[in-house]
Amino acid sequence: MSKPAGSTSRILDIPCKVCGDRSSGKHYGVYACDGCSGFFKRSIRRNRTYVCKSGNQGGCPVDKTHRNQCRACRLKKCLEVNMNKDAVQHERGPRTSTIRKQVALYFRGHKEDNGAAAHFPSTALPAPAFFTAVTQLEPHGLELAAVSATPERQTLVSLAQPTPKYPHEVNGTPMYLYEVATESVCESAARLLFMSIKWAKSVPAFSTLSLQDQLMLLEDAWRELFVLGIAQWAIPVDANTLLAVSGMNTDNTDSQKLNKIISEIQALQEVVARFRQLRLDATEFACLKCIVTFKAVPTHSGSELRSFRNAAAIAALQDEAQLTLNSYIHTRYPTQPCRFGKLLLLLPALRSISPSTIEEVFFKKTIGNVPITRLLSDMYKSSDI
């Protein structure tokens, strides 16, 4: 599949001026990798002031191996190689990179003319006709093309900016380990939510259902899709980091609530670890996403029990997704006869962390009290995605 215009994939074999890693093109006036350009952008936009860890300002090594060890020296190196601070500020105008601002703009109806199309490569092995399109929707990473620089045209799409990453082969499938600092966990969560919606919206079988059924399925499955995304993209789920992100501690949070949050974070860590032990490939993740999405079980909206308009079609789609996964595993992993069963047995664990905890930990700081289900509905209906 050919790469779309404007793809941010690395196409140049030119070293990053800051750390020496392979650059992905010119960023803020110099050739730089995604890691250093993203670090520079966040530092300038948020007006960060760093203190050298060794006390020797500018003396720490800044290379591919050590670039994350001292932010002060890394920023100094960015400035020394003439990265342009003004280019950051004028990119979209000064802003706080939060979902709250983007949601406000989004609800006012602004649309992105250029769009932000993800690069969706095809999978290595063929799949049945029903599922070929689904497996092709698995991206190489949470990587979207740049969006317009016009402030009034920002949408939720602009949250999905490239994050520093390193390729890692898992069963031949490129995965990405994030350089996620506390400040960027919420942005990574936003990208996961965005990509889950974009994925569902792009599944041909999903779009054949009524809009009401599509929204009900998405509202019920978003938590499982989110946790699957954490496992797939190797996003860190360190308890201390997540608590720091949420802002919760013993001084400002009821002990019973805090203990519940900590317990569910531990449950999240356990389920993510179990998925990573099995080293799933992109096709398996795509199949599991369909299995957890196509659930023809009546859902509750407050005290109201809602039923699907076409429950039979939804159940049939889930059956087909399971059959596809089973067939794929038998072909791809003939020496692992129990693999299919192991994957299915993992699915209930995706619901071991409550939606309220995910909202509290990953989204509360950025969207406040806006319900995720409302956000999902409006994002899904948007032509921007």
UniProtKB/Swiss-Prot annotation:
One of the Pfam families matching this protein, by short name: Hormone_recep
Disrupted-gene phenotype: Mice show exhibit hyperaggressivity, decreased body fat and have ocular defects. Female mice lack maternal instincts. In developing brain, there are reduced areas of the ventricular zone and enlarged ventricles. Neuron progenitor cell divide more slowly. There is complete loss of visual acuity, with mice not being able to distinguish the cliff nor light and dark transition.
UniProt-listed Gene3D superfamilies: Erythroid Transcription Factor GATA-1, subunit A, Retinoid X Receptor
Protein's name in the database: Nuclear receptor subfamily 2 group E member 1
Function: Orphan receptor that binds DNA as a monomer to hormone response elements (HRE) containing an extended core motif half-site sequence 5'-AAGGTCA-3' in which the 5' flanking nucleotides participate in determining receptor specificity. Regulates cell cycle progression in neural stem cells of rhe developing brain. Involved in the regulation of retinal development and essential for vision. During retinogenesis, regulates PTEN-Cyclin D expression via binding to the promoter region of PTEN and suppressing its activity. May be involved in retinoic acid receptor (RAR) regulation in retinal cells.
InterPro entries (UniProt xref): NHR-like_dom_sf (IPR035500), Nucl_hrmn_rcpt_lig-bd (IPR000536), Nuclear_hormone_rcpt_NR2 (IPR050274), Nuclear_hrmn_rcpt (IPR001723), Znf_hrmn_rcpt (IPR001628), Znf_NHR/GATA (IPR013088)
Sorted UniProt keywords: Activator, Developmental protein, DNA-binding, Metal-binding, Nucleus, Receptor, Repressor, Transcription, Transcription regulation, Zinc, Zinc-finger
